[in-house]
Amino acid sequence: MTSIWGQIQHILQNTLAPGLFKVWISPLAGEVDGSTLRVEAPNEFVAGWVRDRLFEDIRTAACGVIGDTVEVVVTAGAPAAAAPRPVLAPRPAVVEVVPTAAPVPSVVPAVEARPSGHAPRRLSAETQQAQEQLGLPLDWAPVPQSRTNWRFSFDDFIVGPNNELACAAARGMCRDGLMTDTLFLSSGPGLGKTHLLHAVGRSLCESSNRSNPNVAYLTAEEFASRLIAALKARDVERFKARYRDVDVLLLEDVHFLQGKEKMQDEVLATVKALQSRGSRIVFSSSFAARDLKNVDNQLVSRFCSGFLAGIERPDFDTRRRILREKARIYQVMLPDNVTDLLAERISTDVRQIESCLHNLILKAKLLNRQISLEMAFEIIGNYAQAETQLDFEGIVRMVCEGFGLSPEQLNSRSRKREYVVARNAAYLLARKHTDLSLKEIGDRFNRRHSTVLKGITALEREMNRETPLGRQVANTISLLERNGRITHARH
């Protein structure tokens, strides 16, 4: 039977971003003592980060399992004994990490590969200390590929008119059917880019003749963080060797590199090295390669050197098939009228569709009731989408109302924080809910294309990191979308 902490972790896994859960929740240990949940982190750095940014998420999940009177206490465990830290083995595999029931058959030898004639050496104390002080997100010690747990596969990817080209291209990368070693996937958030990257990684690992296939999967932000860690640890050459010697590189969210020249230089050098040795590379981005700004032309050229595939919003039939497949995985019977309601009302984001379904199932189980249309209406209030899209004028109107600004203030040249945040929210909503291009959005605000792109990227970064500003803006945007769509539908 799943422990209480296991149930809480399961809720968090389905409500937090995968990266947040992977890095910050997985290492935690939890124990319930009466009405107190004691959560132990591996060190004070992690404990402090969890207290500052995830405390309310943990408490909310705990209340759903234990009750509303639960008290959550986050502490740091005692430092581990000074055992030798594992170091690089030849051609290390890299890492993806949501735990599953998959077996863990191998370990990395605790020596670093050295040129012939040299004795193996262990990591310097300075390197170990730098990595430990920087905390979990910057810890880039290798993990054998056999321990990688790919969360998705091609088998559970629902193909529709919106994504069939991207899926076919990803499959082609796995069977040498694409006639190129580079693939660039682009789409808005929550439409399947991560799913396809995981599917490519899983497929290539399963078909490899090697017991330890050399596949690297990480986001551009993780790449940057690990490079910073290597610089601080004075171990850049080992970092370079690690990523320039892989057979497959799966690099997510490359739009993060905009405006970061030094990071772009390292990514470009890595891509050049990999392409010269015939390695396969899959990039993903929230923007098409042509829309990336403040990115070196050579790097953009490398992005465009292979096959470019975009993913659009799923149509009604595809959304309905996604819901049925997820219900099958959850082993629940989903009435047709509930399926149709969810598919009709949530139209822009597959992740929201899955989240809404999960919350519906969780509510039914907690209340020990059957899933019904009435219950679905109660849940969908948090995700409600009208059949028609908001137009640009409606977005401007509701942003002004939501942020307490006049249209003149929203469109002014002022750099006041509240004006900038509101404008960025308007850019994001216009991109999400209209067919306007970034240039057209910029024209309507008398701004440049690059300004709109920068604003959207900055706002998405705040929301993805779940900073106080990011949470506040995400809640405001969600409320605006919900109320704005309801108002729009009534007109």
UniProtKB/Swiss-Prot annotation:
Keyword hit for ATP-binding: yes
Region entry Domain II, spans: 68-146
Function: Plays an essential role in the initiation and regulation of chromosomal replication. ATP-DnaA binds to the origin of replication (oriC) to initiate formation of the DNA replication initiation complex once per cell cycle. Binds the DnaA box (a 9 base pair repeat at the origin) and separates the double-stranded (ds)DNA. Forms a right-handed helical filament on oriC DNA; dsDNA binds to the exterior of the filament while single-stranded (ss)DNA is stabiized in the filament's interior.
Pfam families (UniProt xref): Bac_DnaA, Bac_DnaA_C, DnaA_N
Residues covered by region (Domain IV, binds dsDNA): 365-491
Name of this protein: Chromosomal replication initiator protein DnaA
Domain-level remarks: Domain I is involved in oligomerization and binding regulators, domain II is flexibile and of varying length in different bacteria, domain III forms the AAA+ region, while domain IV binds dsDNA.
TM segment ranges: none
GO biological process per UniProt: DNA replication initiation; regulation of DNA replication
Annotated PROSITE patterns: DNAA
Subunit comment: Oligomerizes as a right-handed, spiral filament on DNA at oriC.
GO MF, one example: lipid binding
Swiss-Prot/TrEMBL keywords: ATP-binding, Cytoplasm, DNA replication, DNA-binding, Lipid-binding, Nucleotide-binding
Lineage top rank: taxon: Bacteria
InterPro entries in UniProt: AAA+_ATPase (IPR003593), Chromosome_initiator_DnaA (IPR001957), Chromosome_initiator_DnaA-like (IPR020591), Chromosome_initiator_DnaA_CS (IPR018312), DnaA_C (IPR013159), DnaA_dom (IPR013317), DnaA_N_dom (IPR024633), DnaA_N_sf (IPR038454)
Protein family per UniProt: Belongs to the DnaA family.
Region (Domain III, AAA+ region): 147-364
Keyword DNA-binding recorded: yes
GO cellular component assignments: cytoplasm; plasma membrane
